[in-house]
């Protein structure tokens, strides 16, 4: 199977084609907000992903947070 070259930004963590040379897809974490019914949850989403050897913490959990500001709350 074809692999993605180092620095390729089309990679998706845990999915899709693997990065070449044993590298992995790593990303920056960005705080995000989503609505679930009437409540809000804050969570971390992965952005600026690319193939390489740097390591970033995987934060996939969303948690209810009423102090979280969604864009439409501004």
From Swiss-Prot:
Which keywords appear in this protein's UniProt record, sorted alphabetically? Calcium channel impairing toxin, Disulfide bond, Ion channel impairing toxin, Neurotoxin, Secreted, Toxin, Voltage-gated calcium channel impairing toxin
Q: Name one GO molecular function term.
A: toxin activity
Q: What start-end ranges are recorded for coiled-coil regions in this protein?
A: none
Q: Where the protein is mainly located, per its record?
A: secreted
Q: How is it modified after translation?
A: Contains 6 disulfide bonds.
Q: Where in the cell is it found?
A: Secreted
Q: Name one GO cellular component term.
A: extracellular region
Tissue/organ expression: Expressed by the venom gland.
Q: Which domain of life is it from?
A: Eukaryota
The record's function comment reads:
Potently blocks vertebrate calcium channels Cav1 and Cav2. Is the most active on Cav2.2/CACNA1B (from HEK) (IC(50)=2.3 nM), followed by Cav2.1/CACNA1A (IC(50)=4.3 nM), Cav2.2/CACNA1B (from oocyte) (IC(50)=14.4 nM), Cav1.2/CACNA1C (IC(50)=26.8 nM), and Cav2.3/CACNA1E (IC(50)=96.4 nM).
Name of the protein: Omega-filistatoxin-Kh1a
């Amino acid at each position: 199977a074809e692999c993605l070259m180092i620095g390729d930004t089309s990679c998706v963590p845990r999915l899709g084609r693997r990065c070449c040379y044993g590298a992995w897809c790593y990303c920056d974490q960005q705080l995000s907000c989503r609505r679930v019914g009437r409540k809000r949850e804050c969570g971390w989403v992965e952005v600026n992903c690319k193939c390489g050897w740097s390591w970033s913490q995987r934060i996939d959990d969303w948690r209810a947070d009423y102090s979280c500001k969604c864009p439409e709350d501004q």
